[in-house]
């Protein structure tokens, strides 16, 4: 491709509204342009990268035995009503009515559509297992689109769905897809972790997220220093450390009128925060136990996903308001504790091993100090309620935990029969009876992968694509003052024709621009291999080569250039 015949839309300045690096660089590199909130036009440089990512995904999915299909973005409401998600999905589901007064949605996902398709096309257990995938546009009406294509309303996703006679068959395909995803992200050159995850609104049992490690990520990824354990922080088990020590002091009731938070209590009374507990009141799962107390160490954070899975706690988790708490317990939120508490309590594992701790007295403006289990108050039910922290023991007993930020680029689920049962998707089993199919689903955010690669691989000059396979161009020909030098022009044109004939994705900068502008643009869009052709070097039989990824520069003999590029260009 010649730049003179290309829409080369680079920007010198960073747009003010771009918050994260990937958004800034995708705008500056001329990859995307905003159209409306969370909606983007993909320009030629961007679409080249997007299609290359899609092709890698497609190749690896095909190798894993999946079969490509394509389903409509527009979906009839009846399917969502049949699955039960019409009322459950929330405002992210964009609903509309066609000219015939029929309800439709713009698909945020395709579980309903694929289940309907397969129940119509597959009738016998002999046709299973079956794994179908598509690469298709999705729409989720995000309340706050942000970070460019990282969290946009319209995006491209690869979603696959597998159908099975039983869970054992599902597990086999799930394991294959786990490996396929690992192959995809390895081939893309990304530093990622596959982590245990919560299934969320999709439903099902087992689930893994594929997280690209980046400081701009929205998720906390937990992994061990000495094993392959990795989990989303929502699912990482917090292991209690040590044994409960014997009491060393008598319990005291202390006036604390100005201490309404843990931090105020610690500051005013010079207490170690790890010797305090906080009591949170949430809605209970039943009318008989309408409020439940969750008790954590003062420096720990509640893990809401863990808490709402407890049978006593309402799902989704909902905190009680102050009026409810005051009416039931008789004290405000700043004075709550485990002594004389008249609602069921669940304490975190770390609280169960505490001794001589401080807590609210359930009397406004008062706290108990030096509280001990069994001696001063009976031990309530113990559960894992908190987020892990850096340095906690790994749940598998190997090493300690590290926590890094991650960008979720893929997610695989074992759905089970949630959708097939609701939508009566059955086949004839080997006994001749109807058999509800067991399902799995497997998603990759294709547009998000592009942004995640940039978040992880960039410098002050622009994008550094982690793999030649996804760079918009793999080789840039940058001729110095070509329009004033016949020898430079002749060699550049000949090299361009040769590389094109060899199938190399090459960009030839034939603009009448200053060399500095040409270098800056090629570095900004991240072309991995740059061939710089100057009149003086050419006369000496040499060509300058620059590697974008390593920063290396070297002189190559003119007659060795093609062999050098063949050896070093990976795509």
Swiss-Prot record:
State whether keyword Aminoacyl-tRNA synthetase applies.
yes
For the keyword Ligase, the answer is yes
* EC id: 6.1.1.15
Give the reactions, separated by semicolons, that this protein catalyses: tRNA(Pro) + L-proline + ATP = L-prolyl-tRNA(Pro) + AMP + diphosphate
A GO molecular function held by the record = ATP binding
Q: What class of enzyme is it?
A: ligase
Ordered alphabetically, the record's keywords are: Aminoacyl-tRNA synthetase, ATP-binding, Cytoplasm, Ligase, Nucleotide-binding, Protein biosynthesis
Quick one: where is this thing mainly located?
Answer: cytoplasm
- Write out the function statement from the record: Catalyzes the attachment of proline to tRNA(Pro) in a two-step reaction: proline is first activated by ATP to form Pro-AMP and then transferred to the acceptor end of tRNA(Pro). As ProRS can inadvertently accommodate and process non-cognate amino acids such as alanine and cysteine, to avoid such errors it has two additional distinct editing activities against alanine. One activity is designated as 'pretransfer' editing and involves the tRNA(Pro)-independent hydrolysis of activated Ala-AMP.
- Per the entry's comment, what about the domains? Consists of three domains: the N-terminal catalytic domain, the editing domain and the C-terminal anticodon-binding domain.
- Put simply, this protein is called Proline--tRNA ligase
Lineage of the native species? Answer: Bacteria, Pseudomonadati, Pseudomonadota, Gammaproteobacteria, Pasteurellales
**What gene name is listed for this protein?**
proS
